[in-house]
Amino acid sequence: MSEVRTRIAPSPTGDPHVGTAYIALFNMAFARKMGGKFILRIEDTDQTRSTPESEKMILDALRWLGLDWAEGPDVGGPYGPYRQSERGDIYGQYAQELIDKGHAFYAFETTEELDQMRNEQKEQGLPQKYDGRALNLTAEEVQAKLDAGVPYVIRMKIPEEGTCVVQDMLRGTIEIDWAQVDMQVLLKADGMPTYHLANVVDDHLMKITHVIRGEEWINSAPKHILLYQYFGWDMPTLCHMPLLRNPDKSKLSKRKNPTSILYYQRMGYMSEAVINYLGRMGWSMPDEREKFSLDEMIEHFDIQRVSLGGPVFDVEKLSWLNGMWIRENLTPETFAQKYVEWALNPEYLMKILPLVIPRVETFSDVADVAGFFLKGMLPITKEDFSSIKLEEETLRKAMQFALWRLEALSKWEKDEIFNEMKALAQVMEIKPKDFFAPLFVAISGTTASVSVFDSMAILGSDISRARMRTAVNVLGGPSKKEAKRWEKEYADL
């Protein structure tokens, strides 16, 4: 049997997600238990959203949790480069191979033509997918368009009838009708590969034997199986893990739960407790004990113990487990050491001090001015907003609209946050000063604070959004009747 090789392949397009850490953990545990290797690959084909800063945050966050990898962009390895953007034109070569073999085709439709196609399908109650119109072009017509420099994508061919059989380690046999599968774009008009082509090519070239990923990829499995068949390659074993869920059983999302690993790091959770909790997501130790280390998980790991019921990511349960780790594993000396590392982290502290120093006269003043930087959720009440110069409904609506705008913000920097909030105040016809005042209360607990936009940038997106969410709830968010009206008003802004 060949060496077991698993991988995690995050996209560096935002904060490191707990879902990424969850899948990485199970990939690493499986590989280590089987005496194999765990690989990290960066899927940065989305050049408009991928950033080096996000990549660094992902690597740092996974390392903070105690995860490490045998090969990756930072440690190298025999099958690199481990960033897709650095792998040159290999994807174009493989896409061309599929064209030459008759398994893929050029498609020349404009965005407008594709939109019109989908709208017509929607009106007729048909599945919205590519209808294969470019397959009707003759070889001469295709060549003429290529010679004329008409922009194109390369799509894969899909069988018109029959069923794809997917074998899954946890779920057994899954059958998916080919009629449900789209003729996937493999190479985009800019020459960059889509996830589906790059993922299959890289997994093959990096000798990945087991693909352990979230169950949201089940419907994509037929495309991947077909690509392996088209290339004549051995298919890795598939394993689709259950998705993490909110306590209300909905898919884990930042609107209902903090999803960034950085949030839990900044909130003062122990990395051992967070990885322990992620290990309990759908899996259990043979003796059913709740508290265990990463090494203990790997020692006893059996992927068949994964339960397919949606595991609930409950922050209260995580806090309880973290408390157990603190009480059972830390002496006063080690607690003091970890607390100082967290609270007086030089990198974090140096961001705060330039805001604090102009506002203090003694060291003892620092706690009053900067205490909110070292807290989780603030104990604010409705009375804390009593000095705000806005009508109650306007205040409630302004805070809800601000939260929605912040949830949609992809670049979390001071100037971006300020510009978004200022623009929102203008379209809502509220003076910026009056609009910003409740933001101060939500973020710092008082209207007399250091710059709220500096504070939000330093605290990070998840803590800032969570505090805003708390403020919206304290003020009384929209009722069911108001919610639809507010959403329409917000969409019309």
UniProtKB/Swiss-Prot annotation:
E.C. numbers: 6.1.1.17
One annotated GO biological process: glutamyl-tRNA aminoacylation
Residues that hold ATP according to the record: 254
KW Cytoplasm (keyword) present: yes
Primary location class: cytoplasm
Pfam family, one: tRNA-synt_1c
Assigned keywords, A-Z: Aminoacyl-tRNA synthetase, ATP-binding, Cytoplasm, Ligase, Nucleotide-binding, Protein biosynthesis
Short sequence motif named 'KMSKS' region, residue ranges: 251-255
Domain of life according to the entry: Bacteria
GO molecular function: ATP binding; glutamate-tRNA ligase activity; tRNA binding; zinc ion binding
Catalytic activity: tRNA(Glu) + L-glutamate + ATP = L-glutamyl-tRNA(Glu) + AMP + diphosphate
Motif 'HIGH' region, residue range(s) on this chain: 10-20
Subcellular location: Cytoplasm
GO CC annotations on file: cytosol
Keyword Chloroplast carried by entry: no
Entry similarity comment: Belongs to the class-I aminoacyl-tRNA synthetase family. Glutamate--tRNA ligase type 1 subfamily.
Assembly behavior: Monomer.
Annotated function: Catalyzes the attachment of glutamate to tRNA(Glu) in a two-step reaction: glutamate is first activated by ATP to form Glu-AMP and then transferred to the acceptor end of tRNA(Glu).
The protein's name: Glutamate--tRNA ligase
Source species of the chain: Marinomonas sp. (strain MWYL1)
